[in-house]
């Protein structure tokens, strides 16, 4: 099941409540402010802070 991009309009980072962006290969939602990546499993984003991956500044910059 693919991630529905329309969800980006209503989903927010669970940490800062900011905007999330879809990464290039459409496997993660990224919060650029907190530098966290949330996996998408079977089309469903896993928006749990303890399951998120911390990103470097270079990795965050690559998600434009």
Curated annotation (Swiss-Prot):
GO terms for cellular component: cytosol. InterPro entries: Trm112-like. Pfam families: Trm112p. Gene3D superfamilies: 2.20.25.10. HAMAP family: UPF0434. Belongs to the UPF0434 family. This is UPF0434 protein MADE_1009415. It comes from Alteromonas mediterranea (strain DSM 17117 / CIP 110805 / LMG 28347 / Deep ecotype). The lineage of its organism: Bacteria, Pseudomonadati, Pseudomonadota, Gammaproteobacteria, Alteromonadales.
């Amino acid at each position: 099941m693919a991630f529905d991009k329309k969800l980006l309009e209503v989903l927010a980072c669970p940490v800062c409540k900011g905007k999330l962006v879809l990464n290039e290969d459409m496997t993660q939602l990224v919060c650029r402010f907190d530098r966290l990546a949330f996996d998408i499993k079977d089309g469903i984003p896993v928006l749990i802070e303890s399951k998120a991956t911390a990103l470097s500044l270079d990795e965050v910059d690559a998600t434009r």
